[in-house]
UniProtKB/Swiss-Prot annotation:
Heme binds at residues 45, 66, 69-70. This is Cytochrome f. Its cofactor is heme. Binds 1 heme group covalently. It is found in: Cellular thylakoid membrane. One of its GO terms (molecular function) is electron transfer activity. The lineage of its organism: Bacteria, Bacillati, Cyanobacteriota, Cyanophyceae, Nostocales. The chain crosses the membrane at residues 299-318. Pfam families: Apocytochr_F_C, Apocytochr_F_N. The keyword Cytoplasm does not apply. Belongs to the cytochrome f family. The gene is petA. GO terms for cellular component: plasma membrane-derived thylakoid membrane. Residues 1-44 form the signal peptide.
Length: 333
């Protein structure tokens, strides 16, 4: 009898252990495969800046890190109100102008349209307004833009893109101002706003490698002995440019599809000479602006002061006219 009970207990224990083990395996499997089936937002564009510079996209020098990969300088504009009241929704407009008739080199070497993107660094406490706080008119201006915070605790740093440049040369950000009455760390005063705008692909990857949207130059001095075209199994195309030096050594430069070769076999080149054109038509630009978080009470007192000054001026004018009338009456008398 005891043996039967013992065997029953062991059987139940074994079943429980197997069930627990099965659940653990299923949980681990789901954990590792969920990132593949449902990619996290951090892996979406622009993950380069977020992964390489997780704390802030702005260097101590003031330079926004996007400029490390997008080497060409292009203009960027921003429009923000001069001052805003607490707990109000306003719009910040980032303008990224460029010639829409030009096309850039795609990753496969083909010609494609330019994409645009922007980063808006707001003061602490400012953030993208919730959906229910955005007026309908402003929603129409925003369109289908998705605003991505730079990090979990960085709601004041917002990233947008890539977006089709032909439709979004102006990106409208709906911003909610903080209320110092609810947050003691927020104070009234003047704050800085930092903006970066980009159009087109970068010339350098964060790893330091060149993209195919860049100029390629000779690695050695000599004569170009051979230019060969190679096609990969995936259909990718690249060119091998062999340079024979005076010592007889052959140095090979690999050029991906995209840049156009401007050299030919038998041509003498020096180290650093361009082998291709520069296909880049895009670029990055940044600028700073200022915004004042205004106290409504101060505005009220300012209006009252202005009204008092105007009233005093009116009284002075009336008094002056009264004196003139008295003087005129005395002269007539």
């Amino acid at each position: 009898m005891r043996n039967a009970c013992t065997r029953a207990r062991l059987t139940r224990t074994a079943r429980a252990m197997v069930k627990t083990l099965f659940i653990a395996i299923a949980s681990v499997t789901f954990f590792f495969t969920s990132d593949l089936a449902l990619p996290q937002s951090a892996a979406a564009y622009p993950f380069w800046a977020q992964q390489t510079y997780p704390e802030t996209p702005r260097e101590p020098t003031g330079r926004i890190v996007c400029a490390n990969c997008h080497l060409a300088a292009k203009p960027t504009e921003v429009e923000v109100p001069q001052s805003v009241l607490p707990d109000t929704v306003f719009k910040a407009v980032v303008k990224i102008p460029y010639d829409t008739s030009v096309q850039q080199v795609g990753a496969d070497g083909s010609k494609v349209g330019l994409n645009v993107g922007a980063v808006l660094m707001l003061p602490e406490g400012f953030k993208i307004a919730p959906e229910d706080r955005i007026p309908e008119e402003l929603k129409e201006e925003i369109g289908d833009v998705y605003f991505q915070p730079y990090g979990e605790d960085k709601d004041n740093i917002v990233i947008v893109g890539p977006l089709p440049g032909e439709q979004y040369q102006e990106i409208v950000f709906p911003v909610l101002s903080p209320n110092p009455a609810n947050d003691k760390n927020i104070h009234f005063g003047k704050y800085s706003v930092h903006v970066g705008g980009n159009r087109g692909r970068g010339q350098v990857y964060p790893t330091g490698e060149k993209s195919n949207n860049n100029l390629y130059s000779a690695a050695a001095t000599g004569t170009i002995s051979k230019i060969a075209k190679q096609e990969g199994e995936d259909g990718s195309v690249k060119y091998l440019v062999d340079i024979k030096t005076e010592s007889g050594e052959v140095v090979s430069d690999t050029i991906p599809a995209g840049p156009e070769l401007i050299v030919s076999e038998g041509q003498a080149v020096k180290a650093g000479d361009a082998l291709t054109n520069n296909p880049n038509v895009g670029g990055f630009g940044q600028l700073d602006a200022e915004i004042v978080l205004q106290d409504a009470n101060r505005v009220g007192w300012l209006i009252a002061f202005v009204a008092l000054v105007m009233l005093a001026q009116v009284m002075l004018v009336l008094k002056k006219k009264q004196v003139e009338k008295v003087q005129a009456a005395e002269m007539n008398f």
